[in-house]
Amino acid sequence: MQNVINTVKGKALEVAEYLTPVLKESKFKETGVITPEEFVAAGDHLVHHCPTWQWATGEELKVKAYLPTDKQFLVTKNVPCYKRCKQMEYSDELEAIIEEDDGDGGWVDTYHNTGITGITEAVKEITLESKDSIKLQDCSALCDEEDEEDEGEAADMEEYEESGLLETDEATLDTRKIVEACKAKADAGGEDAILQTRTYDLYITYDKYYQTPRLWLFGYDEQRQPLTVEHMYEDISQDHVKKTVTIENHPHLPPPPMCSVHPCRHAEVMKKIIETVAEGGGELGVHMYLLIFLKFVQAVIPTIEYDYTRHFTM
């Protein structure tokens, strides 16, 4: 039944997006939405600092006139996913409800303190200097230094909206132990080793109706064979499956359909982050949008290790 409802909603939103005029005037600071031009600027910034992300065009017939032909959407491929969400030990302490007083019952962040369970996310820190412009340290160094550095726990909605938003995470874990454990299982030929070798292709598009970025993902098994929808749902927080995350057609690519993180809350979350930075005497530039965006969607896909940006500190 939920799939039918999502399908109807998806078709209605396609019509609504078609009829929605392109946003021309910046409303980033006021509402958290962005124009297509701002999306491109934020995408250029992401590509510059995280070269694993690249611009793409997609199908020629699906090119959007309000975006440059060669910058229709962003893509990063072969992103590792070593664990299923159900393999993350559940505890009431790990669950937080974001915006519980809204009409939809709030956004449930099931893994907002994943460091407790020993799950390490490959995330570095973004430095947000108080009363100064934002400085981003190049995250591409991860490719050369990931074996030498400790990596902080995953960022999430709870940190941004309810716990000071931009505080430094103290907990760090040695990821080499996790890698060694995975290798040991692989050498033993255990079934668990197969489950821990999935990869995902991730895409970021511009949603003209919601006027925000939108994340899409499609997964593959260890043989690079496409995962079924049910298997991809295993890598998504179960509180978001068929709610925040639905199966829809990519706006720039041919079928099969992909998992998509619904963008209806993105502008609201971004607006709160902007306000928090301003309260600390700083200013959040629109070029940082996608780097922050990739942070708060980790609550939805906590085991997909795509986010190589840095945490925020005030």
Swiss-Prot record:
| Quaternary structure and interacting proteins, as annotated | Homdimer. Interacts with ATG7; this interaction forms an E1-E2 complex that is essential for the transfer of GABARAP thioester from ATG7 to ATG3 and disrupts interaction with the E3 enzyme complex. Interacts with ATG12; this interaction is ATG7-dependent, essential for phosphatidylethanolamine (PE)-conjugated ATG8-like proteins formation and also mediates the autoconjugation of ATG12 on ATG3. Interacts with FNBP1L.
Q: Where is this motif: Increases ATG3 translation efficiency by the ribomome assisted of EIF5A?
A: 101-103
Q: Where is this motif: LIR motif?
A: 104-110
A GO cellular-component term linked to this record: cytosol
An individual GO BP term:
macroautophagy
Q: What does this protein do?
A: E2 conjugating enzyme that catalyzes the covalent conjugation of the C-terminal Gly of ATG8-like proteins (GABARAP, GABARAPL1, GABARAPL2 or MAP1LC3A) to the amino group of phosphatidylethanolamine (PE)-containing lipids in the membrane resulting in membrane-bound ATG8-like proteins which is one of the key steps in the development of autophagic isolation membranes during autophagosome formation. Cycles back and forth between binding to ATG7 for loading with the ATG8-like proteins and binding to E3 enzyme, composed of ATG12, ATG5 and ATG16L1 to promote ATG8-like proteins lipidation.
Protein name, as recorded? Ubiquitin-like-conjugating enzyme ATG3
Q: From what organism does this protein derive?
A: Mus musculus (Mouse)
